Amino acid sequence: MTKESVESYKKIFKKFLSFEDGKILELMDLDNDFFVDFIVFLREEYKLSDNTLYRQMNFFKTFLNWCNTKSMQTNKDYKKVKLNKYNPDTISLTKEDLKVLENLELSKSKSYHRDLFLIGCYSGQRFSDYSVFERSDVQGNMIIKRSEKTESHSFIPLIPQLKSLLDKHDWNLTIISGQKFNDYLKIICQKAGFDEEVKTTKYMGSKKTVEIKKRWEIITSHTARRTFITIASENLMPDHIIMKITGIQDPKTLQRYKKVNKEKVMDYALNVFS
């Protein structure tokens, strides 16, 4: 189990204890009425969006599935809980953006976090995987890495940009929390001038909220993986190769990662109709 997964379990159970408010509940008490009230509580008390609620309730349901494997009696109503999930407003960076980041003058600490993000952009891995690369993972000109989340093996080409970054830090990458990393990343991307306005949509039950944010505000550690996949796809790398590098096993999942920027749309249109 990844460190991020452990933190996610802690978050939902902290909210559960807050909802429980000292009451003693048994697993059989977690019926449909409980889940209706719990979901309302999470929306009203914590202002969770539908996507965040979907993720956190999945962790809660996974825990109940685990209880079943241990022969504990659970109320099976939890299996009927259905929540909406929407495609999130996400972005990817361009090769030009990566050059801007590479040439940015930063303090030692911010420089490290910038490099760590670029390692993700050039490897296509999840943060939990690209933040723990080791020399022992190298075979020839490949990094062979087993994903912490899926336990599948990825074959990651040790391209010059990636090798240079890893060598720069002597392959000694300090492990930090994803949230702390994201905080640093937003500061770095703001300094890089990623100020273009982006429309974001959040769903909370029947309420739809549209916000205008700066591009740097919605860049996270996961943007690195999405950036690799998008750039690889735009440069005609076959999907099955992208999947082998990233460890993605479902083609539908791969499609959700692909983002097309407006410049590429214009380029293709001009090439077709000029």
Predicted regions and their residues:
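C-terminal secondary-structure termini that scaffold catalytic or DNA-interacting sites
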Residues: 171, 175, 183, 194, ...
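A short, basic/aromatic helix-end/turn motif that makes direct DNA contacts
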Residues: 132-138, 233-235, 243-249, 257-260
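Basic, Lys/Arg- and aromatic-enriched nucleic-acid-binding interface segment
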Residues: 50, 54, 73, 78-127, ...
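Catalytic-site neighborhood detector that most strongly recognizes the C-terminal catalytic loop/helix
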Residues: 147-151, 246-271
